[in-house]
A protein has these predicted regions:
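Alpha-helical transmembrane bundles and membrane-interface segments of multipass inner-membrane proteins
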Residues: 1-197
Length: 197
């Protein structure tokens, strides 16, 4: 197995660890900081394995499957967990990801996963090449997760600015998510049409 694929597999295996840390975040800030650190590390690894694969010519079919799977596993897990009220801090029970954000992003990610599977079954084509908007949406989602994990501390120091910042990044996440969703829908339709469906 190539090093990029090993990094991707490690990212996937660390998702349950991230889940456990977030579930314990309200008990101790240490767990929340650990979850934040792990989220940042996974984001860096996500960029690193792609760059490494391209520079070393180690782009493989299994890697093209595992990479988006690792992304979606982390994103969906994080967004579902962060939608729970009081998940991050007992001092801020109302702090959670709004449902209009979580429903939009989780629906988009599930649509991409299911759509990719359907296209593969119908036309035997597996295409996991994210668009520029799709990549931007993923980056903003990582930033949103990090901001949410850091927000209990930020709310103590800059309450108004933190709430404005959170709503801004929530709006940007949804906007990019919807735009990329439409882009993937268009790409999927073209692939099905080319395959005679």
């Amino acid at each position: 197995m190539s090093w990029p694929n090993r990094i991707t597999l490690l990212r996937l295996l660390l998702v349950p660890v991230f889940i456990l840390l977030v579930l314990s975040a309200a008990e101790s800030a240490a767990y929340r900081y650990a979850a934040l650190g792990l989220a940042v590390a996974l984001g860096v690894c996500d960029a690193a394995d792609g760059i490494l694969a391209r520079r070393t010519g180690a782009v493989t079919r299994i890697g093209s499957i595992l990479d988006p799977l690792a992304d979606k596993a982390l994103m969906i897990s994080a967004i579902v967990l962060l939608s729970r009220k009081g998940i991050l801090s007992a001092d801020h029970p109302a702090l959670h990801l709004p449902y209009w954000v979580s429903v939009t992003i989780v629906s988009r990610d599930l649509f991409i996963l299911v759509g990719t599977g359907i296209i593969f079954l119908l036309v035997s084509v597996f295409q996991a090449l994210p668009s520029a908007v799709g990549k931007a949406a993923t980056v903003v989602q990582f930033i949103m997760i990090a901001a949410m994990l850091a927000s209990p501390d930020l709310l103590r120091w800059f309450p108004s600015a933190t709430w404005y910042g959170l709503y801004g990044i929530w709006g940007m996440t949804v906007l990019l998510g919807v735009i990329s969703w439409l882009g993937y829908l268009r790409t999927g339709s073209k692939l099905l049409s080319a395959g005679g469906h």
